[in-house]
């Protein structure tokens, strides 16, 4: 994400989203009743012209602004839509007061006018700082099946499964070696479709991960230099979630947002499982703890951040020296926090 224009007095910031992560951030930065505008194009028909229908009309570009009523983000399609009432634009081309949906496009600027609270600005800065980071990819490999997990700001993008035709009595040793190489090559072709790979974390329960690493060393030495091997009790989604929870990703990258969130929620669940009196969850309980100054770390599901009452709790915790972490709802840890009421806290002392 890039900021291309800013007017602090007007509360106006113009940004250019560059990745799906940026669209996700924008879906939580923009709130209902905010004003957004972008350059749009419409073909204006000349009904008096003698031209054929296919030739009629001139495409005109203009800025159109709406007062936001509805926000929709779909991570799988990479689409972000703002729907609302048109407040600005050329009156001869568009009917003011009617409804319109703005489809936010990557690499196209969008203007946002709003009351920028601390949390909105922090989120915007997160998106800007993350824009230059390279990809970190988890390769969860087993004998016949591999899944890739692309680490995003909002969660994990899963690719796969990639299936290898290896097992079976009909595969004699020579044929098996060929099948293994074909399997490894299929994985690598999928991997190399991702740009700017920084780290490649190869995980799995057996020795297949070692075999794949040896294959990379021999055939793709530059890629092999980015590899970290890690044993896990499972492959697939379960294996990827395992390394997110065990702190490996967090230790490898100070910017691994999802890993930090997963580790915090996992620690919370462990403390709850032990019936610890130094954690609490649920809105009522957390409000009580925050008012007492007992909250050391506050976990807030991102879906709640627009709530002014929740913002007050967050401000109270920070003013009393606590740390606030906003948890994405797009990954497993976020769903676990949601099941606990979307709000939880680690306490300085029992209450």
Swiss-Prot record:
GO terms for biological process: nonfunctional rRNA decay; nuclear-transcribed mRNA catabolic process, no-go decay; nuclear-transcribed mRNA catabolic process, non-stop decay; ribosome disassembly; RNA surveillance. It comes from Methanosphaera stadtmanae (strain ATCC 43021 / DSM 3091 / JCM 11832 / MCB-3). The keyword Hydrolase applies. It is an enzyme of class 3 (hydrolase). The N-terminal domain has the RNA-binding Sm fold. It harbors the endoribonuclease activity. This is Protein pelota homolog. May function in recognizing stalled ribosomes, interact with stem-loop structures in stalled mRNA molecules, and effect endonucleolytic cleavage of the mRNA. May play a role in the release non-functional ribosomes and degradation of damaged mRNAs. Has endoribonuclease activity. Its main location: cytoplasm. The gene is pelA. Its EC number is 3.1.-.-. GO terms for molecular function: endonuclease activity; metal ion binding. The keyword Iron does not apply. PANTHER family: PELOTA, PROTEIN PELOTA HOMOLOG. It is found in: Cytoplasm. Its cofactor is a divalent metal cation. GO terms for cellular component: cytoplasm. InterPro entries: eFR1_2_sf (IPR042226), eRF1_1_Pelota (IPR005140), eRF1_2 (IPR005141), eRF1_3 (IPR005142), Pelota/DOM34_N (IPR038069), Pelota_arc (IPR023521), Ribosomal_eL30-like_sf (IPR029064), Transl-rel_pelota (IPR004405). Gene3D superfamilies: 3.30.1330.30, eRF1 domain 2, Pelota, domain A. Keywords: Cytoplasm, Endonuclease, Hydrolase, Metal-binding, Nuclease. SMART domains: eRF1_1.
